[in-house]
Amino acid sequence: MTKLIVICGATATGKSGLALNLAMRLGSVILSADSRQVYREFDIGTAKPTLAEQRAVPHYLIDICAPRETMTVADYQEQAQALINSLPVSPLLLVGGTGLYIRSIVQGMKIPRVAPNYELRSQLASLGQTTLYGILQQVDPIAAQKIHPNDPVRTLRAVEVFYITGIPISAQQGENPPDYPILQIGLDCEMERLTERIHKRTEQMITDGLVGEVEYLCQKYGAELPLLNTLGYQEIKQYLTGEISLEAAKELTVLHTRQFAKRQRTWFRASPQIEWFNADHPDLLDIVCQHIQQP
């Protein structure tokens, strides 16, 4: 029997909705694979499951960190694997769009346990992505072949690990795939339709109180909190400081979310193990259930 069912794909493709319905049908639980939903108080802007949804189906790996804490991929992997090994439910649903979180589980990535050094990161980031990627090519050409030149997050992390340990990150990584069966399901739709979904979700977040959430978080933790510089929060923060109008903030959020979704699609499409389904199919739940039940 399949131990773990992964539901992945770009943002706004309906992963959470499908997972909720699937979990209720299968009597399962949900493990989040979202790098921002792990943080408490960041709710609306991360599209975190509502309290009603959490009551309907048990959710794990959300609200497990304070906003000023750091959750590394290694931290996530350790907690997720512990849950997978201990929860007396099968199958479990691993749901989200954070590719590294999912890869750390399905491929059993061996991850360097190197804590982030924010002072070093600030110094490295100030060099600019082009210069930083050039450094990566020099100190770790193997990692540079795997990291896109326009991926500042992974570039920065790889260079940071080298500067801290003196050992290339590629030499510290490896894989130890789990011995339990995994089924990977991906949701996707045409880019035009995905853009419509992103528009609708952005409007809904504003209606649900995103502006108030950002204002509260800025007052409580300070506007320079790194999480407040992430997608959906940074744009509203610009509105609150008077830099742009609310309409412009919404337009920027849609634009940046669309760009992010394209990167996610590229990431997940590179995995041949993922079976893809049309997110807009009217019988999506039934089709996915049939796929799961196939021998």
From Swiss-Prot:
**What is an example of a Pfam family matching this protein?**
IPPT
Q: Enumerate the transmembrane spans.
A: none
Return the SUPFAM superfamilies for the record.
Answer: P-loop containing nucleoside triphosphate hydrolases (SSF52540)
Keywords associated with the record: ATP-binding, Magnesium, Nucleotide-binding, Transferase, tRNA processing
The positions annotated for binding ATP are G9, A10, T11, A12, T13, G14, K15, S16
Reactions accelerated catalytically: adenosine(37) in tRNA + dimethylallyl diphosphate = N(6)-dimethylallyladenosine(37) in tRNA + diphosphate
The UniProt family comment states: Belongs to the IPP transferase family.
According to UniProt, the name of this protein is tRNA dimethylallyltransferase
Q: Which gene encodes it?
A: miaA
